[in-house]
Amino acid sequence: MNRVRKVYDTLDTFDGRDVLQSWKREGSRWLDQVENSTYQFPELESSNYERTKGRVPTEHIDLRSPIICTKLSWSQDGTSLVAVFNDYGVRQYLLPEEEGTGLVPFKRFFRAQPAVDCCIHPEYSLFNDSDACNVMLASSRDLPIQLLSLSPHAREHRPLFSYSVVNAENERFETMFSLSFSHYSGFLAGTSRNKVVAYDLNYKSPIWSSDGYGKPLRGTSARRAIISCFDSPSDSESVLRYAGTYRCDIYGIDLRTKELNFLANKQTLELKENSAGVAELLFSVNKHYLYVIKRNSQTIDVLDARSSFAKINELYLSFRIGSQKIIATLDLINGLLIGTHDGKILQWASNMVEFGGLLPRTPEGPAKDSAVSKVFDTSYAGSRINILASSPSNPHLIAGSFSPDKFEADHTAKSGLFVVDL
């Protein structure tokens, strides 16, 4: 068994099921950091719930639930992380100079409502000369999409700008379930009825929208026809994007023709009826293969982008992904990495991933099947590793989130963030 080398983590800051106590530990560690540094750190913003000791109505946040990271992103230069948590907190972490140091927020602020989805600008960095790219998008139910500042100098975090989500046909707010920057000054949003909406950062109203079918859907079909995720392009100016849905449909999005093109569905993917939607789309670095990660599934589907996205292979997991999403990462150095329910990391090597999950043919014999290349132990046994993200500047550094199963009442729950070296 291989073992990763832990570089940083959040220690026990988010352990347990007491949100107020976790905030208290976080504040104490931030004070220790400030006292031992000559740098002037921005003061951590407090939550309304912390200021009132939880005496305000808590119709959204459960103060006895574990604090879990729901979105984790690197800055483009690999010097910092942005993490969005289910306590409504947005935290920015600068990687410490000394290994083994606890991760303490450089900056923290709280939103007034939970985020359905969010994404940071692809050029974000705390070391940018300008704050133009130090922004993130966040969607919530019954609210416009909000553009929020991630500037280290920002003292207030009211939205910089808002984007309309009103359906022109019925004048109701549409919930945007997925967000992704499509280029430096525009983004895509995915909603119900398989609709993709495109925005320019400088305009309130959408610039175009398109859906992925010709006939209206009703009932259960309509509720599950939701754009659940977009691919993560390596080229921010790409004119071709891809989207998955909770019905396990996959679409190509041509930003030039402003149309969605059907690529695959539950039938062509040969999925069982209880498969509950696409959680992530990852392309191999050579763009030949699309890896499809699904909820309520024990396999990762491999589609051939050169052959009409036909399914050509499956990668088998040692566990079943449930309703709580698990987010993997893929890069040229590490190949495909995904966390497990018991604190391990599975790896399919790059030379396998770039050949559709098969080891390339050798003079001694044909291509070999898609078994896991390595299994890594971590320091987080007993917790699920629910997010992995490789550093854009040093892919050997992998950031991740670990947490308990949010649907189980485990009062010894351990949660937090880590950075490990593979």
Swiss-Prot record:
Keywords: mRNA processing, mRNA splicing, Nucleus
Cell compartment(s), UniProt: Nucleus
One CC-aspect GO term: nucleus
GO biological process: mRNA processing; RNA splicing
InterPro entries xref list: Quinoprotein_ADH-like_sf, SWT21/TCAB1_mRNA_Telomere, WD40/YVTN_repeat-like_dom_sf
Location (main, coarse): nucleus
Disulphide-bonded residues: none
Coiled-coil segments: none
Family: Belongs to the SWT21 family.
Chain's role: Involved in mRNA splicing. Helps to stabilize the U1 snRNP-5' splice site interaction.
Quaternary structure and interacting proteins, as annotated: Associates with snRNPs.
Protein name (record): Protein SWT21
Annotated organism of origin: Lachancea thermotolerans (strain ATCC 56472 / CBS 6340 / NRRL Y-8284) (Yeast)
